């Protein structure tokens, strides 16, 4: 804190934080159970997968508060900001047994970030008759998932086929999802209080105030599938490495490998509210 030339006091409080961490989760079981097998006394699975997950997490935060005190008047300026970012890679292997047994491999890569900010200006004034306080604030929050990528592959179980036992992709099994959420909140309030008949045995307190708030939110999603026409691609196209063989410039075309927009506007919305 500081004492200013006019006799007022100024106080400052600030902080910064940063963290970086990597995490690995190995051999996690991801299963769904059906009806328990009482005859063999063991669980029955609808699917049973083993996941390996690799995460990188980054967190950043900042805090800055100011206070100005001058006699019977006090003013405050408050700010806080936080952001979290996460890179995540999940590798999944296992099987699904709904109508038949399917050996599967699944890969997911996504980056997700979340940010929040809150700021406020406030004042407190001691009057001859009572106390007056007011504040005005703004808050912001967002969540961003700019490119979630999912690849699903399944083992060819057709006995006698040239690619029997190999992992392959099918239509719609390479997908990309995009999501963004933003929210803004602005608010203001004022309050007045005073004690009536101060000093007497019966001294009621009068309080009045006003408050207003405006909130707006915008949520947007997009979804894409990769589809392909096997008649215009190599016979072993679906069995290649997804990055090195399939998603190559030479494979793209309206009658070859193309991107299908599967976005549904019902999954997106925009709204506001006044209080």
Protein language model regions, located:
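Short loop/turn motifs that connect adjacent beta-strands in outer-membrane beta-barrel proteins
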Residues: 2-10, 72, 128-131, 145, ...
